[in-house]
């Protein structure tokens, strides 16, 4: 078996049972991985030098094909309502078949780290069948120094073989695609999908399981730091403005997607970014756009024209086009991946019902309520004339990656907020003056002004009113922002329609929260919007 590249000889991939391979490439850098990718016909080059790969039928994650091993260790700690179980026996059989399938193949190994905090990191070894997958994950996780690689010992292993097709009957799975996670042995097997995001989210899932037991809060969020060292955390589902609003030229970007919060402050789990590129432009997002125009970046499912120019407006393969690049491709990114204790937490929502104010201050109990709710609203497709928005609730702002019960994360968040006296804000980047189809999108200028006032501390001195529907505190006046926009009801021409819409949204919150009622105390229950409606 031919082995090339720097690695710890005492911890080769044979320790994972992988033997009789034709070749193993350890820790290759971008240039070598480009050569191997092109040699094997896995991807193309863009005119600017990015590596452009297509993932075939899977252009996103396959959450319905993800399984967690249910054993004596995970039985009482995993939220089984949200995680599909797999027996240890089925996993063992799958693992043996993965090892058999790999024989005679070339494999690529990247020895990486998840977590910028030395006390709360995991050494994650990622073994891939595709060379471009190796570059992708190298871009996204934290890369150890060349010296550290010689003594690197993996704590977690991911084996990604897209050519492996699972037999549903043999393993008790759903389709030919499988993502099997053994949290006890820290082994992840990915088969039957070429979508690279599965590898990244597997490390996130492992950290989301391991860290709460150490009192560290894992978060699906972006984070940045101001010139005075004040850290801000941004929670938000897709389409709420998390990436856009945390990419602030006056602040240092800590990371765009996954972080931990522990005794030393906030730290990035990753060493790179995985940004959406659909309709990306140099004018709207210059920093992200610049990363797509250079060597080393991986473009996923981006369409190229005959001159190999990327067309970011072309969504014919998928709307979920992406680019993966190291964090240091962003000019004002943190070199350490670490920030202090957060001063502000921002929970972003895009309320397409037009009911919520552009900003509200939350108590720790209200913050836990809205964190567990994880609300935003998607706009329905207009091709059939459907203009009714659709409410989306994804608990902890990232339900698919949370192995434990949401209340564990919620209680930990609330404890840390109280302990460090963090100011919490709910920011609505959705609609004002009416619901989607009637009102207009919240002006980004107003959102940025409100955010700036929250982050510099001046908003704390404003006069607040209590919102009659949600019970949180809303500023009455903020310099540089029209007063009317701060009171959503006043922006609606039809006040009766507003009240009806507000009641409808409140009812959705209440109905969604029923599953958490037995897991929270009275203070959090009292943060529910329905309580306020009843008290009116």
From Swiss-Prot:
InterPro entries (alphabetical): PEP_carboxykinase_ATP, PEP_carboxykinase_C, PEP_carboxykinase_N, PEPCK_ATP_CS
Enzyme class, spelled out: lyase
Similarity comment text for this entry: Belongs to the phosphoenolpyruvate carboxykinase (ATP) family.
Designated gene of the protein: pckA
EC number: 4.1.1.49
Keyword Nucleotide-binding: yes
Molecular functions per Gene Ontology: ATP binding; metal ion binding; phosphoenolpyruvate carboxykinase (ATP) activity
Name this protein carries in UniProt: Phosphoenolpyruvate carboxykinase (ATP)
Details of cofactor binding: Binds 1 Mn(2+) ion per subunit.
Positions of Mn(2+) binding: 201, 220, 257
Transmembrane parts of this sequence: none
Organism lineage: Bacteria, Pseudomonadati, Pseudomonadota, Alphaproteobacteria, Hyphomicrobiales
Keyword flag ATP-binding: yes
Binding sites annotated in the UniProt record for ATP: 201, 220, 236-244, 285, 322, 447
Location relative to the cell: Cytoplasm
